[in-house]
């Protein structure tokens, strides 16, 4: 008869990789064409000038410039990219 009880294995101890959502470029930051500005689920942030919405609701830049956030009503924020005139 065993003096100590054998330890059992556990089926826990795993976790899924986080989705890395959120704002990637903040207001006033420079972006180039194709830069991801926001990764999101749903559409809390809406695309504005020079910004397009990807199929997974990601917002990305269509032009080189600076990111501008503009509040619309209470829930939604419009994201614009203002092109750099002097380069």
Swiss-Prot record:
Q: Which PROSITE patterns match?
A: RIBOSOMAL_L27 (PS00831)
GO MF terms held by the record: structural constituent of ribosome
Keywords (alphabetical) are: Chloroplast, Plastid, Ribonucleoprotein, Ribosomal protein
Q: Which Pfam families has this protein been placed in?
A: Ribosomal_L27
Compartment annotation: Plastid, Chloroplast
Q: Which InterPro entries does the record cross-reference, listed alphabetically?
A: Ribosomal_bL27, Ribosomal_bL27_CS
Entry annotated with the keyword Plastid: yes
The UniProt entry's GO biological process terms, in alphabetical order, are: translation
According to the UniProt record, where is the region Disordered? 1-20
First-listed, main subcellular location of the protein, grouped into a coarse class: plastid
> Which sequence ranges form a coiled-coil region, renumbered to this chain?
none
Question: What GO CC terms are in its UniProt record?
Answer: chloroplast; ribonucleoprotein complex; ribosome
Asked whether the keyword Plastid is assigned, the reply is: yes
Task: Identify its protein family.
Answer: Belongs to the bacterial ribosomal protein bL27 family.
Q: Which NCBIfam families match?
A: L27
Which named protein is this?
Large ribosomal subunit protein bL27c
Q: Which organism is it from?
A: Gracilaria tenuistipitata var. liui
Source species taxonomy:
Eukaryota, Rhodophyta, Florideophyceae, Rhodymeniophycidae, Gracilariales
Give me the gene this protein comes from. Answer: rpl27
């Amino acid at each position: 008869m065993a003096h100590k009880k054998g330890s059992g294995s556990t089926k826990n101890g795993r976790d899924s990789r986080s989705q890395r959502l959120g704002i990637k470029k903040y207001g006033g930051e420079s972006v180039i064409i194709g830069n991801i500005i926001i990764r999101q689920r749903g559409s809390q942030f809406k695309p504005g000038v020079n910004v397009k919405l990807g199929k997974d609701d990601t917002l990305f830049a269509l032009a080189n410039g600076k990111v501008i956030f503009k509040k619309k009503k209470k829930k939604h924020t419009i994201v614009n990219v203002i092109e750099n005139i002097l380069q």
